[in-house]
């Protein structure tokens, strides 16, 4: 394999891992094939406005989706 091929292979392996890193309020972790985020403690478990529980965290059935304390 040429040097360029090895570099491409390394980039293809590293890029998906970098996608799990998030800046801001949540910390990304991979669990059981899905992406779960640790929500800020100030983020409610239910959605007051019906579409977003806190900045960037969507609601599913009135609960914060993708967060450890939301189902």
UniProtKB/Swiss-Prot annotation:
Q: Which residues carry this modification: Histidine amide?
A: 69
GO cellular component term, pick one: extracellular region
Q: What compartments host this protein?
A: Secreted
Cite the GO molecular-function annotations of the record. toxin activity
Tissue specificity, please? Answer: Expressed by the venom duct.
Residue list for modification 6'-bromotryptophan = 51
PTM sites of type 5-hydroxylysine:
55
Write the signal peptide boundaries. Answer: 1-19
Q: Give the modified residues of type 4-hydroxyproline.
A: 40, 44, 58
Q: Which residues carry this modification: 4-carboxyglutamate?
A: 52
Task: Supply the alphabetized keyword list.
Answer: Amidation, Bromination, Cleavage on pair of basic residues, Disulfide bond, Gamma-carboxyglutamic acid, Hydroxylation, Secreted, Signal, Toxin
Q: Does the keyword Flavoprotein apply?
A: no
- PTM comment for this protein? Contains 4 disulfide bonds.
**What are the residue ranges of the propeptide?**
20-35
- Domain remarks in the Swiss-Prot or TrEMBL record: The cysteine framework is XIII (C-C-C-CC-C-C-C).
Indicate the family of this protein.
Belongs to the conotoxin G superfamily.
Protein's name in the database: Conotoxin De13.1
Originating organism: Conasprella delessertii
């Amino acid at each position: 394999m040429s040097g360029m091929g090895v570099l491409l292979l390394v980039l293809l392996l590293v890029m998906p891992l970098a996608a799990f890193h998030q800046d801001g309020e949540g910390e990304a972790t991979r669990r059981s094939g899905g992406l779960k985020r640790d929500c800020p403690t100030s983020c409610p478990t239910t959605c007051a406005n019906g579409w977003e529980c806190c900045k960037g965290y969507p609601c599913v059935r009135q609960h914060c989706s993708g967060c450890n304390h939301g189902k």
